[in-house]
Amino acid sequence: MIKFLNRAFGGIVILTILILITYLGRIPLALGVAAFSYIALHEMDKALKKIDLQLPMKCLYLTNGLIMIAAFINNSDIYIASIVVSVLFLFMYIILTRHYTLYDAFAAAFVMLYVSFLISHILRIKNVSYVWMLYITAWGSDTFAYLVGSLFGKHKMDWMAHISPNKTLEGSIGGIIGATILNIVYCREFGLDNNIREIIVFTIIAAIMSQIGDLIASYIK
C-alpha cells in the first residue's frame, strides 16, 4: 500500500505541474513539453548506453528542437516537413560521421519517433480539453493498473514476463477502465460537450499507448 501511495503521489505531483503549465497558456505549455522531451532524450541515452548503444545526441537534440517548433506552429505541412528533414538529417549525420553502427542508427530513429514525434503531438492538439484528458489518461491508467493489478491481478501476462513480470491482465484492463471513468467525470463536471463514445474511444486508445510506452521504457531499462 505504501508503494502504491508513493506512486500515486508522484503521479499527482507530475500531473499538477502539467496542469499548471497548461493553464498558464500555450507558450508555457510548449516550453514545458520541450523541456520534458529533452529530459526524456537524456534518459533514453543513459538507458541505451547500458546495452552498448550510442546515440548521436547532438543531432537528436537539434532535430527535437526543430520538431517541437514545427509542432508549436501547428501547420501540418511544416510539421511533416520537419519530420522528413529530421529523419534525413539524422541518417546523413550518422553516415558522414562514421562513428555509429547500424544498430545505433535504428536506435536513434526509434528514439526520435518515441520521444520527439510522440511528445510533440501534445502541442498539435487544438482543443485543450483533449490535452487535459491526455494527462488524466496517463495518470489514471498507470495508477488504476497498479491498484487493480495489486488487489485483483491473477492472470500474469507470461509473454511479457521478461519485461515486466508483475503485469496482469486485470491490471491492464483496470487501468483502461479507471482512466475512462475519470475522463467521463472530468467532461461531465466541466460541462464539456464531448459525447460518451468519443470519450471512451479517445481514452482507450490513449491508455493503450500509455501502457505500451511504459512497457517500452521497462524493456529499455
Language-model features, listed with the residues they occupy:
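Membrane-embedded alpha-helical bundles of polytopic integral membrane proteins
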Residues: 1-204
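Short helical (or helix-break) motifs at transmembrane helix termini and adjacent helical loops
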Residues: 141-150, 210-221
